[in-house]
């Protein structure tokens, strides 16, 4: 098996060029204060934060459109009562803090079908790439949601892309994309996955529910279904994300893979942190610019925050009940399973979609594990070469002999 050279990633290896402005690991007190940054770092943080605000407003506008029907629902007394019942259901699950009850394991191996990916994917990877799919056997955790969740046609077919070496199985790096960012090609290039592949890893790119080919027919954008069905719909989407990924782990384990690392960005970072609290087959986990309290994050997302506030006001929603219910799918509600030295969190100081304070909350919950920051925003990962080298140094002892 080819060894990994932790510091060998040059800037020219990156398919998407970004400035190599170094970040650093957090100190014992957490992320750096503004005064601790160099002038160049402060300029990059400030400019990237402004760019993120524009992007955040655009995404929040899309989310607002998906949530408008919920305002009409709030006007109907029966739907408002049903939502309160659902909130209590997830709040009670969250209060138990038992990940095995909250996220039951798959009961059968997936029946996976595979076909070669397109030539562009194989050219990017410089290796064997296949697109795999299997039918999800997920059953909604909330009995009241089972008919609705079972009725999704495309969402209940799981999709992933697998990069494999001829002499496999190899240690596998799994990646979970962010909200609306499901394209395999984009993620492969953005995270420099061809370089990880050449370092000896097999790679698995997992598609979240309601994204990409899992988006239901007539969905206006990838990821629409995540927020289109109210809080209960979001909770079940997260439950299905965990369940279907565990089915993917079953498949990898069946094919002989015994070392799996997991990383994810944004919503994918949130999901990867949650999975690391549920399944002990994850050897190492790296949430990248994660959200950990989506309800608090959306509070800052204009105009979506106004739509949520209006809906809650009309329905007479109990704010404390909402906060308790949203903890159901938060990684802050469960203990991580990988050992402390196998957890690495990455945050962007200029991030205004998943503010660095979110990552810092996870860092505190995860016993102040390794925490790396870079001076960019949510999508412009300035110093990405630096944190990719950091990821490789972090992973090598666990993934390779």
What are the roles of these predicted feature ranges?
Residues 376-389:
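Catalytic histidine-centered segment of alpha/beta-hydrolase-like enzymes
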Residues 1-145, 152:
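N-terminal targeting or regulatory segments adjacent to alpha/beta-hydrolase or S9 domains
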Residues 174-239:
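Cap/lid segment of the alpha/beta-hydrolase catalytic domain
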Residues 338-339, 344-347, 351:
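Short beta-strand/loop motif that positions the catalytic acidic residue
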Residues 352-358, 383:
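Conserved alpha/beta-hydrolase "acid-adjacent" motif
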Residues 274-320, 373:
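Hydrolase active-site cap/lid region
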Residues 264-272:
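Gly/Ala-rich beta-loop-alpha elbow adjacent to hydrolase catalytic centers
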Residues 152-158, 164-173:
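Proline/glycine-enriched tight loop/beta-turn segments at coil->beta junctions
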